[in-house]
A protein has these predicted regions:
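A cross-family "folded-core" feature that marks the main globular domain of proteins
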Residues: 1-146
Length: 146
């Protein structure tokens, strides 16, 4: 599965997506897939391991490679964290979330807040909108929501 990508951030996102999809990933296979050294992959996995740890989740390792086993709510938490980190990087963010869908939900939610005369910090709005979008996207891709 050879892939074209533009850099480290994009590669990490693609590896992350494969992990949350349940793939077992070996360093060697990832190095071949992304045309980088095994040491680059080791740094990527280390970065992702820290990301998962921030949500008190763990990547697991066995003879077939690195993998993640978790519930849909755990996937949602770590996916949301990664998305929030990438909000200021449109190209990277668009690999995680459909930007048009995010904008549509964001505008609708903000309109509803104005109509109901509810004030809310922007960080809360971003978090709520992102949660809604992630639920919609994962449900539309037939993911098991638990």
């Amino acid at each position: 599965m050879k892939m074209n990508y533009s850099g480290t951030s994009e590669r990490r996102i693609l590896i992350f997506k494969r992990l949350i999809a349940g793939e077992h990933l070996s360093y060697q296979q990832l190095a071949e897939d992304y045309f980088v050294s095994r040491s680059s992959i080791a740094k990527d996995i280390s970065y992702l391991k820290e990301l998962f740890q921030k949500e008190s989740l763990r990547l697991r390792f066995d003879n077939s490679g690195t993998f993640f086993e978790g519930s849909e709510s755990q996937i949602h938490r770590v996916l949301k964290r990664f998305c929030l980190m990438m909000l200021d990087q449109p190209a990277a963010f668009s690999l995680l979330v459909e930007p048009e869908k995010y904008q549509e939900v964001n505008q609708a939610f903000r309109r509803a807040l104005v109509e109901k005369q509810v004030e809310m910090p922007d960080s809360y709005i971003q978090s709520i909108v992102l949660s809604i979008v992630l639920l919609i996207e994962r449900a539309s891709h037939a993911e098991n929501l638990v």
